[in-house]
Curated annotation (Swiss-Prot):
Domain ATP-cone: 49-139
Organism of derivation: Alteromonas mediterranea (strain DSM 17117 / CIP 110805 / LMG 28347 / Deep ecotype)
Gene Ontology MF terms: ATP binding; DNA binding; zinc ion binding
PANTHER family per record: TRANSCRIPTIONAL REPRESSOR NRDR
Zinc finger (unnamed): 3-34
Protein name as catalogued: Transcriptional repressor NrdR
Gene that specifies this protein: nrdR1
């Protein structure tokens, strides 16, 4: 790595530590020429698959959109922010594990519903009602009945 002070290429790692819950490595480096010290952060570049929407259009995976959808479904429910963040990490991991460059919005929606079913059943029904476009109260009842099975 190049020294940010003198642009020399030869630097030495003098300390490494895991940070960000093990998602990054913090390294203290020293330039072998000017002896200045600096910090670098290293993390894996994990490429998320693109999402193929119902109309056939494609868009990049949007973590903020996922978070907003989960928060909307979980509004006024007793689920901690920490659990929501764990859910997001798990969903992203499942998407990457498909090994595909593109995934359907249907697959993503089903993964979200499965996660919400385990997290909070009321939030699951809220999300399912929008995702599956429930037309009347009967469809709500059928979904709630399936939860009891």
């Amino acid at each position: 790595m190049f020294c940010p002070f003198c642009s020399e290429q030869e630097t030495k790692v003098i300390d490494s530590r895991l940070v960000a819950e093990g998602q990054q490595v913090r390294r203290r480096r020293e330039c072998m020429v000017c002896h200045e010290r600096f910090t670098t952060f290293e993390s894996a570049e994990l490429v998320m698959p693109r999402v193929i929407k119902r109309d056939g259009s494609r868009e990049p995976f949007n973590e903020d959109k996922l978070r907003a959808g989960l928060q909307r479904a979980l509004e006024k429910r007793p689920v901690s922010t920490e659990k929501v963040e764990q859910c997001i990490l798990s969903l992203k991991s499942q998407l990457r594990a498909t090994g595909e460059r593109e995934v359907s919005s249907e697959l993503l929606g089903n993964l979200i519903m499965k996660a919400l079913k385990e997290l909070d059943k009321v939030a699951y029904v809220r999300f399912a009602s929008v995702y599956r476009s429930f037309e009347d109260i009967r469809e709500f009842g059928e979904e709630i009945a399936r939860l009891g099975d």
